[in-house]
């Protein structure tokens, strides 16, 4: 029986009666039927997912199966029953050399004493978390610091030693919130942090608080860097109505990531990542950028970004 861990893909969609795969290298289309030779392994994986769902009642969780970590989302439909959307995570943390950032942005990430938020935006399935994990590991490795990754659910392989530093992982769940996990990270003396994906006001609030004193990496859904800042502020203001000033003072790096399929003829041969990123602190336009964020004039930041000059 051929194993799913032999494949490179984005999502596997399993339901009683069908199995489809999205973004598979070597496929003729972005979404296609799972090849028959992998159906047996997919059936076993679906059974494992169903057991976890029934036992825990979770509708989102991660699991290690056949040496790979998968993030699972459970969907229930009255007519078709239970479906599982299974995101494949990388076998290893992406080497930082493979993250397409400019030299000033690379220096910004490893800059000693740097604090604030490195916010990575993009569409769903664009590889934001993969990039965020690579950024955090590079920061830990170069600065020799203690880092903590707080995820919901865990989908990276960050736990362990990296260079002269170390990363610990905490999973948000029934007995752990982003708030309690962040407090633990502070008590541990961590100086850098990965806080999952910003999907609500509470998570945004924890990210904002942590970025006042720490180097923080997080992700957010957004169609551009401007949209990402707007959404982040919107979430922060659900709890703190005067959040714009704190965001302006703590937003360190803003990045927008896209993923496109690389085709050779009719076959998907791979995936290409592109990142548009800016350091908002170590640049001559810092004061103007802060002012526009405090005013909520995010689209006007295009003027500063187009002519940005770094002072690193």
Identify the function of each model-found stretch.
Residues 1-66, 71-312:
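Short, flexible helix-loop junctions that flank or precede catalytic/ligand sites
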């Amino acid at each position: 029986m051929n194993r799913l861990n032999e494949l490179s893909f984005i999502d596997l969609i399993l339901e009683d009666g069908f199995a489809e795969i999205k973004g598979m290298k070597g496929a003729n289309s972005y979404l296609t039927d799972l090849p028959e030779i992998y159906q047996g392994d997919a059936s076993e994986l679906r059974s494992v997912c169903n057991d976890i769902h029934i036992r825990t009642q979770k509708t989102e969780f991660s699991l290690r199966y056949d040496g790979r970590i998968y993030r699972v989302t459970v969907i229930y439909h009255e007519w078709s029953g239970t479906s599982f959307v299974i995101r494949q995570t990388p076998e290893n943390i992406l080497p930082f050399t493979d993250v397409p950032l400019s030299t000033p942005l690379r220096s910004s990430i490893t800059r000693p004493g740097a604090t604030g938020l490195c916010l990575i935006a993009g569409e769903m399935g664009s590889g934001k978390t993969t990039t965020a994990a690579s950024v955090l590991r590079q920061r830990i490795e170069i600065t020799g610091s203690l880092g903590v990754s707080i995820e919901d659910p865990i989908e990276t392989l960050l736990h362990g030693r990296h260079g002269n530093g170390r990363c610990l992982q905490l999973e948000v769940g029934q007995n752990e919130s982003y708030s309690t996990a962040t407090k633990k990270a502070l008590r541990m003396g961590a100086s850098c942090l990965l806080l999952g994906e910003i999907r609500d006001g509470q998570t945004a609030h924890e990210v904002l608080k942590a970025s006042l004193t720490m180097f923080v990496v997080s992700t957010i859904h957004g169609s551009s860097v401007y949209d990402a800042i707007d959404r982040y502020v919107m979430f922060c203001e659900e709890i703190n109505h005067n959040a714009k000033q704190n965001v302006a003072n703590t937003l360190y790096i803003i990045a927008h990531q896209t993923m496109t399929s690389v085709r050779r003829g009719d076959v998907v041969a791979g995936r290409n990542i592109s990142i548009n990123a800016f350091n908002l602190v170590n640049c001559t336009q810092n004061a103007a950028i802060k002012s526009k964020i405090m005013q909520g004039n995010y689209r006007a930041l295009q003027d500063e970004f187009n002519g940005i000059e770094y002072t690193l």
